[in-house]
């Protein structure tokens, strides 16, 4: 019975092989006819995980010809032959109940024979029936592990480009036919090899069949025929190629993309990883656009949306930021003045060709421009180098020492060991010092042979004591300081208010005056019973009264000792010396910083005549600061000279007769009042300045209304410039708002905070003034007028 059963099983296998051959000739249309192979392949589904990767590349190369289906069938049979026969036997039992117990064993050798023959011979199915009897069973088994090994370790690195190139070889029409035939046959006849492909986890070739299998309603109907249609005998000729190509699909995703129509899920997962090749592969399969084209398109659109979202995320954060908020808030330029940046330099003034006075000659731009052009032609550095040379000439490195009779002499030299040369000294050797009669020689140390090491300017040398008159010897420096300072009072006024410091007082505030025990302090003002304001060592400040011994106190009038001084101050204007001035001529009045001068007469716009106690003389007005109003009665010269200049001011401006100190300004911008104290105005309005609250705010009057307004919104009127020029004798001054560095020799350089005595207007943008003995021109927008109290 066993022999009969084996013969019957072999006959059935031969008949099935013939059926396979017939179906391969008819290609795909014959797939639904043979349902017999399905029971064999379905059970091996979970077990054939190892052989699956080999199948994927084959169908990719020959999809249109239909060999892909035969290769899948062959793979399914080979896997069933390795150990999946127990699963295939029950399915065959369902089809042929007589052979159920016997078929599980023999279909497996039959399949292995056919596969063996195919792999070894590579011939068509016609030879398979004969070879099925001759080929032994164990031969095909080692082939499968070889295939799996090849898949695990691909030896051919050049195979992936072959796979990519294989799909385009087929025409679009043939591929479309293959997909259509597969799409039509697969739903009706779901091939069993598909479940095996899922278990194997191979590339999308098998997954394509897997998707087709679930579409079939019943696996028991014609699926067996579909498996028989897949010819395992045609595959042997391409077995080796499939091994090579089986390795290829794993690294490359293009075969997966081609089979996207069968597996929309994988398309969605894999397309975003390789977006560039997709557009070219869309037309290869019609089902791709129908089934998986949509999700792939959604993925493509999804990515740019995400990118836009990520990019827009930064943009979205921009709008909510603070910049848009101030737009709806208070307008900044209306109330707040612009940042204090130095204004632009105005163009040089256009001066008339002829000048009426010699004082304007230095400001002739043509001469300075010619000098600058010469400097630029001679020096590569140009103007910058010329500037440095100019300033170096203006500021000598070491001025000569004050000589006896100079007000600075007693303050700066009496405490220093020094002497005065009695005769002209000509050095006979390099160690001696040459000097002229009257030069002040600073004594450095005692030299050998009874000589003294002295210094004159930057030169040092030896001088014999017989050639000089020693004023402060080396060993009397501590004693001579207080005595000398006491002597220094006599030439000025021995009765001037002063005191002697009893204790050292270190300054703790910016306006404090540091004192050392024994120093003499000039008393300028008595603040209260406990504090004085005084001057010492060319410094002015406040100090406590209990730290000094008052020698001559300040009278209650706080103007000085003598009644005549107080009466004069009540009658006429007073000036406070801003700098020390030493007269070069006998008719000049010398004074120290902080001293109060009675202004008795204006000699001209630059010079005035004044009195300090019992001394009188002329002095430059730019060295003093006017602190008293001009009296209606007082010095005749003052009353005769000032009123005409005030009258000249009146025609320049309509309402300047109200008060000489009043200034007019012109609005550069419109100003809207934000508080009840603000003074609104429009651009071009002329405003009378009543008070300067600080450097940024003024109080003014416009149309019978008073209020405060920002200084940066206005500028002095051109007519005011002329008035100011004529008011210079009254002590009109300007204060520097910014640092200004002159670019030409005729320009006046200054720093912010300097007070300049303005002497003459040049034009609407420039004026001429003096500062610390230097005269020059400067731009008006760098300064502001100071209120005259």
Swiss-Prot record:
Its main location: cytoplasm. Residues 296-305, 474-484 have a biased composition (Basic and acidic residues). It is found in: Cytoplasm. Residues 352-361 have a biased composition (Low complexity). The keyword Transmembrane does not apply. One of its GO terms (cellular component) is cytoplasm. Interacts with ADAM12. Isoform 2 (but not isoform 1) interacts with ADAM9, ADAM10, ADAM15 and ADAM17. Interacts with SH3GL1 SH3 domain. Interacts via SH3 3 and SH3 4 or SH3 4 and SH3 5 domains with SOS2. Probably forms a trimeric complex with SH3GL1 and SOS2. Interacts with SH3YL1. May play a role in regulating A disintegrin and metalloproteases (ADAMs) in the signaling of EGFR-ligand shedding. May be involved in suppression of Ras-induced cellular transformation and Ras-mediated activation of ELK1. Plays a role in the regulation of cell morphology and cytoskeletal organization. This is SH3 domain-containing protein 19. It comes from Mus musculus (Mouse). The gene is Sh3d19.
